[in-house]
């Protein structure tokens, strides 16, 4: 399989990520239903000698969407071209990519929800009929020509599937929602990554690290690398529970996997807005980061873990958030919600 990046990457970080990335479905830990559906479709496409149907992978950051795109190309024995929605600014940019694809190739578009509407429209006929309609010239003399494309597989990844228009979404043969990982799955991922990084870690330390990883493999691997650094510096050479605890204190990550920004968001919601409801933009302005960053990076785990709930009027802190921060509710003011939002 040849892998070509159409988007600039941090080479060092990408090489390390590729070292830890599973290459086949049977190496991929977690997402059982997603793997089963992909396995059936891949095997069927290979039997029929066809390109795999287009795939949309949706879910919070760090759950393995990019990894699955590469696995799809590996399993199909084809090349993968990697780009992202914000990079494709002009119709000509996408046309150049599409016309360079060979039969069966995988085109992976990360952040596909950030494609412009005009770019999306080019994809309609490309995905459905493997045809490319482009305009030549301008004004009254402009004319449209249609080019044939080699059958290919588009794999799109998104953290905000609701922003993808129905015409584009409906052209994906498979729409797969990735879920947060269980502590046991994260423990398996951590132990596998430790073997690849050639660092020893005991079971208790792996379990502890998994519990701090927010249900997210990318975070688990990032924390593992930082804990490995501490084990190297302190001379033990092996990751023990104490190593993990010490590293978590240094990084400000608590027993629930919350970091300083998570706690700041909860504290602002409770102290500035009396527990809510509060709008996302108001919270973002108070903590000093973009609203999109909160909704894509922080909010999914805070919702999943029961620290906040979303209502028609905005976000509200739950009793669990108050307890976690050690803040008493003032004279009955505060959330009427328990940790499940009921």
UniProtKB/Swiss-Prot annotation:
InterPro entries: AAA+_ATPase, AAA_lid_4, DNA_helicase_Holl-junc_RuvB, P-loop_NTPase, RuvB-like_N, RuvB_C, WH-like_DNA-bd_sf, WH_DNA-bd_sf. It catalyses: ATP + H2O = ADP + phosphate + H(+). DNA binds at residues 310, 315. Residues 182-252 are annotated as: Small ATPAse domain (RuvB-S). GO terms for molecular function: ATP binding; ATP hydrolysis activity; four-way junction DNA binding; four-way junction helicase activity. It is found in: Cytoplasm. Its EC number is 3.6.4.-. SMART domains: AAA. It comes from the Bacteria. ATP binds at residues 20-21, 62, 65-67, 128-130, 171, 181, 218. Residues 1-181 are annotated as: Large ATPase domain (RuvB-L). The keyword 4Fe-4S does not apply. Has 3 domains, the large (RuvB-L) and small ATPase (RuvB-S) domains and the C-terminal head (RuvB-H) domain. The head domain binds DNA, while the ATPase domains jointly bind ATP, ADP or are empty depending on the state of the subunit in the translocation cycle. During a single DNA translocation step the structure of each domain remains the same, but their relative positions change. Homohexamer. Forms an RuvA(8)-RuvB(12)-Holliday junction (HJ) complex. HJ DNA is sandwiched between 2 RuvA tetramers; dsDNA enters through RuvA and exits via RuvB. An RuvB hexamer assembles on each DNA strand where it exits the tetramer. Each RuvB hexamer is contacted by two RuvA subunits (via domain III) on 2 adjacent RuvB subunits; this complex drives branch migration. In the full resolvosome a probable DNA-RuvA(4)-RuvB(12)-RuvC(2) complex forms which resolves the HJ. The RuvA-RuvB-RuvC complex processes Holliday junction (HJ) DNA during genetic recombination and DNA repair, while the RuvA-RuvB complex plays an important role in the rescue of blocked DNA replication forks via replication fork reversal (RFR). RuvA specifically binds to HJ cruciform DNA, conferring on it an open structure. The RuvB hexamer acts as an ATP-dependent pump, pulling dsDNA into and through the RuvAB complex. RuvB forms 2 homohexamers on either side of HJ DNA bound by 1 or 2 RuvA tetramers; 4 subunits per hexamer contact DNA at a time. NCBIfam families: PRK00080.1, ruvB. Belongs to the RuvB family. This is Holliday junction branch migration complex subunit RuvB. It comes from Kosmotoga olearia (strain ATCC BAA-1733 / DSM 21960 / TBF 19.5.1). The lineage of its organism: Bacteria, Thermotogati, Thermotogota, Thermotogae, Kosmotogales. The gene is ruvB.
